[in-house]
Amino acid sequence: MPQLDTSTWFIMIFSMFLTLFILFQLKISNHYYPENPMTKSAKIAGQHNPWENKWTKIYSLLSLPPQ
C-alpha cells in the first residue's frame, strides 16, 4: 500500500490561509466606517402603528361556547 505524500500540505494550507486573509482584508478595507457614530435614542416619539386604534380581543378556546 503506497504512503500518502504530505510534504506539501503545510505550504498549501498556509498559502490558503494567507490568501483568504488578504482577500478579507481587501474586502473590509473597501467599506466606509463613520468615525464618530451617533447613538440613536431608544425613545421613539410620534410613531403611529395601524393596530393601535383597533380594539382586539383574543379568545381562549376554553372560553368559547361549546359547539
UniProtKB/Swiss-Prot annotation:
MF terms in GO: proton transmembrane transporter activity
Swiss-Prot/TrEMBL keywords: Acetylation, ATP synthesis, CF(0), Hydrogen ion transport, Ion transport, Membrane, Mitochondrion, Transmembrane, Transmembrane helix, Transport
Record has Transmembrane as a keyword: yes
Pfam families: ATP-synt_8
Localisation: Mitochondrion membrane
Membrane topology term: Single-pass membrane protein
Sequence positions bearing N6-acetyllysine: K54, K57
Residues with N6-succinyllysine modification: K54
GO annotation, biological process: proton motive force-driven ATP synthesis
CC annotations in GO: mitochondrial membrane; proton-transporting ATP synthase complex
Segments traversing the membrane: 8-24
Annotated family: Belongs to the ATPase protein 8 family.
Subunit structure comment from the entry: Component of the ATP synthase complex composed at least of ATP5F1A/subunit alpha, ATP5F1B/subunit beta, ATP5MC1/subunit c (homooctomer), MT-ATP6/subunit a, MT-ATP8/subunit 8, ATP5ME/subunit e, ATP5MF/subunit f, ATP5MG/subunit g, ATP5MK/subunit k, ATP5MJ/subunit j, ATP5F1C/subunit gamma, ATP5F1D/subunit delta, ATP5F1E/subunit epsilon, ATP5PF/subunit F6, ATP5PB/subunit b, ATP5PD/subunit d, ATP5PO/subunit OSCP.
Function: Subunit 8, of the mitochondrial membrane ATP synthase complex (F(1)F(0) ATP synthase or Complex V) that produces ATP from ADP in the presence of a proton gradient across the membrane which is generated by electron transport complexes of the respiratory chain. ATP synthase complex consist of a soluble F(1) head domain - the catalytic core - and a membrane F(1) domain - the membrane proton channel. These two domains are linked by a central stalk rotating inside the F(1) region and a stationary peripheral stalk.
Record's protein name: ATP synthase F(0) complex subunit 8
Source species: Canis lupus (Gray wolf)
